[in-house]
Curated annotation (Swiss-Prot):
It comes from Gluconobacter oxydans (strain 621H) (Gluconobacter suboxydans). The keyword Ribonucleoprotein applies. Part of the 50S ribosomal subunit; part of the 5S rRNA/L5/L18/L25 subcomplex. Contacts the 5S and 23S rRNAs. Keywords: Ribonucleoprotein, Ribosomal protein, RNA-binding, rRNA-binding. This is Large ribosomal subunit protein uL18.
């Protein structure tokens, strides 16, 4: 039987393939969540470029003294990625939550991005 890491990699590739097939050429809003921080990127897979990104590791957010591991930080990142995406000319995206459940920080980021002007 395949190793656990190999199975996770296969699942990750399968999810990416499904997203690309259903995206219809729209950029992808990718979310990465760690135990201490959350990151979001708007990626154009056709060109292989990152159009906008936001993270709790950015200097302005770190200087505020807040942790990046809570729902309020995810909400700030969601609004920030939406603002930067709209500035880059992106209105519609495909939400790529990876293997994370649509709950908690991931849900807060998605809802804040919708409020900020992105549609998915």
């Amino acid at each position: 039987m395949a190793s656990q890491q190999g199975l996770q990699e296969r699942r990750r590739q399968r999810l990416r393939f499904q997203l690309r097939r259903k995206s219809g050429g729209r950029p992808r809003l990718s979310v990465f969540r760690s135990s201490k921080h959350i990151h979001a990127q708007i990626i154009d897979d056709a060109q292989g470029r990152t159009l906008a990104s936001a993270s709790t590791l950015e200097k302005t957010l770190r200087d505020a003294g807040k942790t990046g591991a809570d729902v309020s930080a995810a909400t700030v990142i969601g609004k920030l990625i939406a603002e930067r995406g709209v500035a880059a000319g992106v209105k519609t995206v495909v939400f790529d939550r990876g293997s994370y459940l649509y709950h908690g920080r991931v849900k807060a980021l998605a809802e804040a991005a919708r409020e900020g002007g992105l549609s998915f």
